[in-house]
Amino acid sequence: GETLPLVVALHGGSGHGRQFLWSWLRAVRSDPCILIAPTSSERTWSLMNPEADSQRLHGLVAYAQEHWSIDPERILLTGMSDGGTFSYVCGLQSDSPFTHLAPCSASFHPMLMEVVDPARAQGLPIYLMHGALDWMFPVSVAQEANTALSAAGAKVVYREIENLSHSY
């Protein structure tokens, strides 16, 4: 049978997966996939203790693979704001099941690259989006992420959106 891509979409801080799911409906209707929009275990994603939410996300991927015909080459982790930041944290771990990352309006700490396995970053497709008018995380944060990830060998597509602030 036909395999479908899996998209795991992470909401922003104090958000909820049920609400974030709605922002994806049009895209899913035009480009079919299996979509999971989980809710963080706390008020936001466990940025300081990544294992807490990372293990849950790994479990969701495994569940999806058991129940649907998932394309193993197209497993995307994306997120908005804190969800985007967590997509870096979780998606860059060496045991990550995700084949693609797409952080949006996310924070990125350069120290993160010091704990990333160079083999994990090498060739990893990352679609990085950030609004030029972002008031929460300045666009310079995304520019630094683009530079650091590209230098590590990731295949980064960088998209700075001219009139976008901190939104999706």
Model regions and ranges:
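A domain-start/cap signature at the N-terminus of enzymes
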Residues: G1-L6, D82, C90, Q143-V157
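Gly/Ser-rich "nucleophile elbow"/oxyanion-hole loop immediately N-terminal to the catalytic nucleophile
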Residues: E2-T3, W45-D82, P97
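Loop/turn elements at helix/coil->beta-strand transitions in domains of secreted/extracellular proteins
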Residues: E2-L6, D31-I34, D71-R74, D95-H100, ...
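The feature captures the conserved acid-bearing segment of alpha/beta-hydrolase catalytic domains
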Residues: H100, S105-Y168
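Short substrate-entry loop that stabilizes the transition state in hydrolases
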Residues: G1-S46, P110
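Primarily recognizes the serine-hydrolase "nucleophile elbow" in alpha/beta-hydrolase
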Residues: E73-A121
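Short, surface-exposed alpha-helical segments at coil->helix boundaries
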Residues: R18, W22, S54, H58, ...
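Cell-envelope and extracellular/periplasmic
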Residues: H11-G15, S41, Q65-W68, M80, ...
